[in-house]
Amino acid sequence: MNIKDQYFDGERPLYESRDLRLERVTIGEGESGLKESRHILAENCRFEGMYVIWECEDVTCRNCYFASSDRAPLWYCRDLRLFDCLIDAPKAFREIDRLTLERIKITDGAEAFWYCRISEISDLQIEQATYAFMHSRDLRVSHLWLAGKYTFQYARNLEIHNAVLDTKDAFWNSEDCTIYDSEIKSEYLGWYSKNLRLVRCRISGTQPLCYAENLVLEDCSFAPDADRAFEKSSIRATILGELPSIVDPLPGSLIENR
């Protein structure tokens, strides 16, 4: 069924929809506009009510807008795909299985991407990303711009390419995460991580990469403020240029300057 140029509000206006195409539709004030729906395509739509896409399956959104009033807009879904969307809503993406994002901007990234699994993301800009990506796993992302704090904590099996990350306390207690060709500004980066691997990255911020297990750095460089690195970490590293200071890495660690 196709629905074009209509406005819906109230509670559950399109609840349990099936095989639905929405074009230039607004879901206004209310809750759970598309809850428990299946096989949905939304194009050039506007979502204003809270909890709009919850417990849904096989949903694609193109050129859509999620307003700040649409709190927690995308939770508990499977096979969710967004392209060319703007999200002003906080707490987007919670417990999503099989998530695809391309060319997305999120202006309030607080608590976004918690417990998301099997994700492919490219060209994502996320602001105010406090605690974003907590407990996410099996994530592949390229061209990420992120500003926030406490991000990627307890994340598992992440691969990130060509990112700019400005985030305090990132990757704490993470496991099996690899970052390529990225700029990372993070005080206390990667504490208590396991199998964190950084390849051709530029790192800034005090006391990076402490208490880390099996830390690997390949051709990385450090800014002058990245002091007191590697305390109590087990590490294999090749460093380009000078490293401001090192504090007591574990015995057996190998650090080579080029």
Predicted regions, residues:
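Long, distal/terminal scaffolding or interaction modules
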Residues: M1-R258
